[in-house]
């Protein structure tokens, strides 16, 4: 409604002698439109988060009752030639993987499978410390797992999309101070023609022509590059947004164990990069509203400033994406193990001795599928 009012007042300005009051009304309607749209987006996000948290709790309750169908069973990782995973049902329906997996990304799923089938002996103790720490954070894990309720983040797809976006060619002119100065001067001149047409005898057609020229310049210089960026992200815009939320959630951690500190440090350094990538992707998506695109380009040069943000992101962050996605996948897998540890508190950490011989001692043994025996 407010958007239609904005257009209506702009039209009235061009066909009536009412002058600046119609422009003021158009500006107020535009501000109201932006405010209502942002409030609606935030409300949708809160509702979706609440529904996702409820689903997480329902799944965990079902898990405690012996139902693992909602979770990934890892069937794709079954290898009949593996030394042990095939014989002891590590992967597949009702498997160990099926009981453990809570990953929110495909990269985390792959990493969890690797931990179970090819563990790194040199990091066993550090990994156990990280799992114990995450197991002690049920509220944090619950909100983290909520990010993967609707669908898992396609880690490889997101990485490919971000690499493709990083390769989009942007002219260096867009970051020049001179470009910004010229753009702001042109915008100020456009607003000046509007004011002069309202308070003097200057024909309103002058403002209309200057606005059309300004809009044509912005679209002509920016539209092609931004469309290329939109094609690069394609259908992965929602996936990238989900991945950004996962990164932000990890950044909220205050780790104490050595492995988590290292991984968190890597991901925390990526927070600004992924957050900016998320903002850019959302802005690219909003360009699908043609009328909104015209208005925001006309009065705010939105495409030009979006292209500047995009160019700065390419320059500052594009080369570090692989390292960051690997760290996120590692934490994702650790969260799954931590959830399993939390759900089975009777399980204890094995104590490794320095003896040369082969020996073992166990008390209160239990099987993950059969329980205590």
What are these regions (language model features)?
Residues 1-373:
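Alpha-helical coupling/stalk and coiled-coil linker elements that connect catalytic or binding modules
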């Amino acid at each position: 409604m407010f958007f239609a009012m904005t257009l209506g007042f702009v039209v009235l300005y061009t066909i009536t002698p009412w002058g600046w009051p119609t422009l003021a009304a158009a500006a107020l309607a535009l501000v109201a439109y932006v405010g209502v749209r942002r409030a609606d987006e935030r409300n949708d996000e809160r509702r979706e988060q609440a529904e996702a948290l409820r689903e997480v709790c329902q799944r965990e309750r079902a898990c405690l009752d012996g139902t693992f169908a909602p979770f990934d069973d890892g069937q794709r990782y079954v290898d009949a030639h593996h030394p042990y995973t095939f014989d002891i049902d590590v992967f597949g329906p009702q498997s160990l993987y099926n009981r453990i997996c809570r990953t929110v990304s495909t990269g985390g799923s792959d990493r969890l499978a690797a931990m179970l089938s090819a563990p790194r002996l040199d990091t066993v103790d550090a990994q156990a410390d990280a799992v114990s720490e995450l197991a002690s954070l049920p509220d944090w894990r619950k909100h983290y797992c909520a990010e993967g309720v609707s669908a898992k983040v396609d880690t490889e797809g997101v990485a490919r999309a971000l690499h493709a976006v990083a390769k989009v060619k942007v002219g260096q002119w867009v970051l020049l101070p001179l470009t910004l100065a010229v753009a702001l001067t042109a915008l100020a001149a456009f607003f000046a023609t509007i004011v002069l047409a309202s308070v003097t005898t200057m024909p309103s057609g002058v403002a209309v022509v200057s606005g059309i020229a300004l809009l044509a310049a912005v679209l002509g210089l920016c539209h092609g590059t931004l469309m290329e960026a939109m094609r690069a992200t394609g259908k992965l815009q929602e996936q990238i947004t989900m991945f950004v939320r996962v990164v932000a959630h990890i950044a909220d951690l205050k780790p104490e164990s050595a492995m988590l500190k290292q991984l968190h440090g890597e991901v925390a350094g990526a927070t600004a990069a992924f957050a900016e990538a998320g903002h850019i992707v959302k802005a690219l998506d909003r360009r699908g509203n043609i009328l909104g695109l015209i208005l925001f380009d006309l009065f705010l040069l939105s495409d030009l400033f979006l292209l500047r943000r995009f160019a700065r992101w390419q320059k500052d962050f594009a080369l570090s994406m692989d390292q960051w996605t690997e760290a996120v996948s590692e934490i994702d897998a650790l969260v799954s193990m931590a959830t399993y540890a939390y759900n089975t508190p009777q399980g204890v950490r094995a104590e490794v001795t320095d003896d040369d011989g082969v020996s073992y001692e166990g008390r209160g043994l239990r099987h993950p599928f059969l329980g205590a025996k």
